[in-house]
Amino acid sequence: MKLVLVSGRSGSGKSVALRVLEDLGYYCVDNLPLQMMESLLEQLKGRSDLVAISVDVRNMPSEEIQLEKQLAKLPKDTEILSFFLNSSDNVLLKRYSETRRLHPLSRSKVSLKEAIQLEGKLLDPIAKLVDHYIDTSNLNIYELSDKVREILLGTVDKELVINFESFGFKYGMPTEADFMFDVRFLPNPHWETELRPLTGLDEPVQQFLSQQPLVNKFIWQIENLLETWLPHLERNNRSYLTIAIGCTGGQHRSVYVTDQLAKLFNKGKHKVQARHRELKHD
């Protein structure tokens, strides 16, 4: 089992790092008391090999030896990787002023500045023990995400899940679509008597549509459009992209185009899914 511990000063980006880990398949727990780690890992045994835990100052031991004792209780086969995120006092002050959130150490007689400085002193011994120390003072959330991903994977590239979905306009447009293409202008197999009861997954319909120059040109142009912009979408920290293809009833043209695009992109590095919404109505 691989365990990633994320600690650091409040406001430095721990929640951002945890979201990256969640996208990478980690079972994530926010602000778990260290004494509960052993129990959590025992419960997750056989269910998840990737676990990430964020710990804030309220759950951290006051001495290094206490932390070492807690980690020593974990199963021997646990691979531990640790992060410490930090920012300058001025940056943290600005972030808290903008969000107007309450600092974990804020009390009636303690100012925000004093709470930030106190947290830094309390966490300083822990900061010296971690595998990766990240100063987020000059990083935005995308740059921090890339940095965490690069440490874990050796690359900033993100596995983008591309979901191609066919649908029929007569049943309504999918609300989750990022891109939507209308293929009702393409030659319609519905008007061929022998093709009408079939779908775009059946060979006779595929042969009919593959012989239409307009269909082939449309698929080629959509492929080029997506190939051009996918790298930019990935750098924008997207986890998935839904591309909807619609025709009148969602039986022939949209199903065929969706199927062909899914096959084309399956040859690349992306994880591709294909779904035919209206075929489930049968």
Swiss-Prot record:
It comes from the Bacteria. The keyword ATP-binding applies. Keywords: ATP-binding, GTP-binding, Nucleotide-binding. ATP binds at G8, R9, S10, G11, S12, G13, K14, S15. The keyword Acyltransferase does not apply. InterPro entries: P-loop_NTPase, RapZ-like, RapZ-like_N, RapZ_C. GTP binds at D56, V57, R58, N59. It holds the Pfam family RapZ-like_N. GO terms for molecular function: ATP binding; GTP binding. Signal peptide: none annotated. NCBIfam families: PRK05416.1 (NF003828). Belongs to the RapZ-like family. Displays ATPase and GTPase activities. This is Nucleotide-binding protein Shew_3314. It comes from Shewanella loihica (strain ATCC BAA-1088 / PV-4).
